[in-house]
Amino acid sequence: MLNQNLHLNYLSGNSVFQRVLCLRRNLVKIIATLGPSSSSGSVIAQMARVGADIFRINMSHGDQRSWESMVSAVVEAESMVERDLGLVADLEGPRLRIGDIEPVRVQPGSTIVFSYSGGDVTIPHREFFEVLGEGDIVLIGDGKVSLIVESVEGLTAKLKVLQGDLIESRKGVVVSGKEPELPTLTAKDKMCLEYVARRPFSHVMVSYARSSEQIELVRSILRDYGRQDVKVLAKIETPSGVRRVKEIAQVADGIVVARGDLGMHYSLEDIPVIQRDIVKVARTQYKPVILATEFLSSMIEKPAPSRSEVVDIYEAVRISVDALLLTGETAIGRYPVKTVQWMSRVIVKAQQGLNVDRPPAVAQIYRLARGLVELAENLNAILVIYSKTGRFAERIASFRPTKPYYVGVPSEKVARALRILWASEPVVVGDTSYEEGLVRTSRLLEEKGVLGPGDTVVEAAWSSEKGVYLVRVRNMVV
């Protein structure tokens, strides 16, 4: 991994600077979930080479031992591909789940008993029975099993199966149209945050985000551990999250549209509209936005996607989101590398002729960011910036450059965090002044052949502490 000695050696003319730049093709980033199919360093490296920039560990599954193995594999893959990779911890969150049971396959028309303890299916949550009423629809897993409540007596309920499948331990349970009062963070979530603070995670996803206070609590815990650099992403997947998405977006570092869980609460035909509205909220608040789940579900078993899946990815790119999240396709699927490769192919195709929608720029720093993006486009120039914290890069990404832009950063922590942003390509050049940071970044890009004779370069930096903006245009001499 890159260290300060390498920075110094590079600046003194030594060629030992080993970080290889990724000459990016896809502007929309790909997040791949790790699991049994993709937990080795070699597979992660292959996924990174064909288009994945960020890797997600779902903390609903496994334990610290299995997570540690995946973290180590990502670090190993970084060495193989010679670039920093984003690493996301997805908290399990407060969710109703089935207890430990023997798997039971249910058939339509049959009846089954849910109980707080015992019964055919154990639901170890009093909150579930407190909101349950006759006629309620209960969904299990991703909605593969649906039931209607026939009667409720205390902590026991009798339900009739509408749609049958296998019911297993730890599957999520949703009462359609109702949200039980659950804790903001579970004890497991807090344990996970302590683990995250000790490892090289760049982002945390807060599952079932319902309020701004929930996001602030996660941020304060990370701050107490000295990890204020970790970006906090709010997953919108419940009706309360949808209702409060504006206030949540104001405090979160990014928004995740969890379409799978939203489909448990809303009619499926409503999901595209909800998705569009959430994306619009995030974009107008200059926050990164990610679409999640079921993009290439058929590739869990098959080596190529369906036509409708290709169209889904295409349309997601056309609304200019920052990243797309693969879940089971790469975690448990038979073709994790091919899945990433297919998603990257569709993204690149969808970008052709894309007319990006740019939000209005109100504050001065946003006007500067938009102006830089448009200046680079008008000059057909390559945009190069230096950012100590990554905030300037986030603002640039908000205005959707139509080709990659390069961000000189002081550390690998900042580089990993920026991987999730639209079109960004972070380059670690060390902690220095803004002027020197730009010099180092452009010099490195020249050495790697990204910048060359005949190129026009727009260079920029912004110091929030000093209130100083630095902008210059250079024509590379032939």
Where are these regions (language model features)?
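Non-catalytic helical/linker scaffolds that mediate oligomerization, partner binding
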Residues: 5-478
